[in-house]
Amino acid sequence: MVNIRENAARILPAALMAGAALFMISPVVIVLTGSLTDGIGPYIDFFVWQPAQLRAMCNSILIALCVSVGTVLVSVPAAYVFAKVRFRGRGFLFYLYIIVMMMPFSVTLLPQYILSREIGIYDTPLSMILPGIFAPFAAFLLTQMMKSIPDEILEAVRLETDSPWGLLWYVLIPTVRPGIVCAAALVFAEYWNAVAEPLVLMESAEQLPMAVVLDTVGGADAAAYTAVILFCAVPLFLFSYFETEIMEGLGAYRLK
């Protein structure tokens, strides 16, 4: 009787976790099998016979990739300045970043629309890319990670190199790599799935990303529709691949 209870105590949690895992992965399996109902025909149609859909997918890749890479290039030096460079007004500027980050999305969308009209980038990918690059979330996240690096280590490195870029490249970037990957992945997923921004900042069908034109794809053809949905689920695979870095990066997402 004791052995039965011990076995049940071990098997039941494992069975529950396996059931939960199957339940969570079932949407991906359903979409994958649905897209292969007609073989690989829907995928061939997508890349060969549907230029509008392919263009929308390329727009999504262009916007999400440019914003994620640009965000890292801008946020890493900004985080270094906030975390390790002392100057008058640093605290005020940093908390201004936090205030902007906490603003409702709709509050910043209208200024983006007006500014894109004024500088001539309305109805182009730049209307989404430029504001996205300077979004404060990534800088805030990386600042928290860089604050945890002891100043003594940085002083020792400064004895070897006088260049702040050398310090950034050889010490800070390797140390905060999980935060960089986390920020890039989250920003990529955000702009890959963006719907409101392109609806406000773009009007030409040729400029719209896949998340917006998804409703026009497939029609009665369920296989084609599920094939496109699978392409739109790219961030899921991205998160799975970088799971460790993302979790470590989110662990540093706290005020110090």
Predicted features and spans:
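A structural signal for multi-pass alpha-helical bundles of membrane permease subunits
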Residues: 3-256
